[in-house]
Design a protein with these regions (language model features):
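Long hydrophobic segments that form regular secondary structure
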Residues: 1-15, 20-33, 54, 154-242, ...
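Glycine-rich phosphate/pyrophosphate-binding loop regions near the starts of catalytic domains
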Residues: 1-170, 182-188, 193, 261
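Glycine-/charge-enriched secondary-structure boundary and capping motifs
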Residues: 96-103, 107-112, 116-136, 193, ...
Length: 346
């Protein structure tokens, strides 16, 4: 309330709140800086591998802050776990904390506080009690140094190039990007299985630092991380947020299409770059490479003036979905679960 909100939750990967001008010695003459905040927990990953899941929670929170141009500073954790008096519960808590600690050290985001809730159970439909999945929720704050450079997730202009930062789309095996523990497996196949992706903290650091620098230089029009649902869902969210369409050309190969579309992990971020910034963008990538920083980047497509999300591979159409259909499906998700229907959004 009265906190000078710059970006509301949902408009970007993190909420942004302006820091008001202060009085006295050393005070800011005007509001030029802001605090960004985000909360994350890849609950499926934690259930399958608490250590990797704990690392992923911190990495995703930092990535979300970087997507708005904020420098990650610190976290607070909210640890919700079953009984630690059982071998499984004790192991889950210990390994999740180890993962949180490893990622916090690797990304320079200290833990400033938190809380713990143990002995949590849920009642099944048949009346039996079952331990909850381990749920280490990470809240992270970051600093926006210049309010003139805050980036949302929505495409901005037709003709902007769409780039993927982070582990590239490829048919080959990459432990950093997998289908294990994904939304796709759970929603489409009803499976919660596999070992989640390896968390590459060095890649996270380099990609996030590069993105923040590019945003500060005005090279990036939008940025959105690939998390739940992978590439296909991230692209759909950017389309729904903007009303602009997009065309993506997936790399050819013998790999599984569902892996290309829905795999998760890999410190990946989808960004759009205006044509006027193409040369400067490529120079920034070249400079990062020359400096020894690992910042993989692929140009996947272009923002379109039409109201459709399309994807193809080797010129063969794979996906062609109207944005209105995507938005209706998204907005009807809760009513569908509740057995009710809402009128379509105007």
């Amino acid at each position: 309330v009265q906190a000078n909100t710059v970006v509301l939750p949902g408009g970007a990967d993190a909420a942004v709140v302006r820091l008001r001008p202060q009085q006295g010695a050393g005070a800011m003459a005007k509001a030029t800086r802001a605090v960004a905040a985000v909360v994350d927990c890849p609950n499926r990953w934690v259930a399958l591998d608490p250590e990797r899941g704990g690392m992923a929670a911190v990495a995703e929170a930092a990535r979300n802050l970087s997507c708005v141009g904020a420098e990650p500073l610190a976290i607070t954790d909210n640890l919700n776990f079953p009984s630690p008096e059982t071998p499984t519960g004790y192991w889950q808590l210990a390994m999740a904390c180890r993962g949180l600690a490893t990622a916090c050290k690797g990304l320079d985001t200290p833990v400033t506080g938190g809380n713990v809730s143990l002995y949590n159970e849920t009642r099944l439909p048949d009346g039996r009690m079952q331990p909850i999945h381990p749920t280490p929720v990470v809240g992270m704050v970051g600093l926006v140094h210049d309010l003139a450079h805050v980036t949302g997730l929505a495409w901005q202009e037709a003709g902007d190039a769409i780039w993927l930062l982070g582990a590239p789309l490829a048919a080959g095996a990459d432990e950093r990007v997998t289908l294990a523990g994904t939304s796709y497996l759970e929603c489409i196949h009803g499976q919660l299985t596999g070992r989640p992706p390896v968390i590459d903290l060095a890649l996270e650091r380099s990609v996030q630092a590069f993105l923040r620098q590019a945003i500060s230089q005005g090279l990036v029009a939008s940025a959105h991380d690939l998390s739940d649902g992978g590439l296909a869902v991230a692209a759909a969210e950017c389309c729904m947020a903007s009303g602009l369409g997009a065309h993506l050309e997936l790399p050819a190969g013998d790999g599984r299409l569902d892996h290309l579309l829905f795999a998760e992990g890999g410190a990946r971020i989808l960004v759009s770059v205006p044509p006027a910034q193409t040369v400067a963008w490529q120079q920034a990538l070249d400079q990062a490479s020359s400096a020894g920083h690992d910042v993989p980047a692929q140009c996947l497509g272009v923002v379109a003036a039409g109201a459709d999300l399309s994807m193809s591979q080797a010129g063969i159409p794979l996906v062609e979905l109207p944005i209105d259909q995507l938005r209706t499906t998204f907005e009807q998700a809760i009513p569908r679960r509740m057995g009710a229907d809402l009128p379509p959004t105007a």
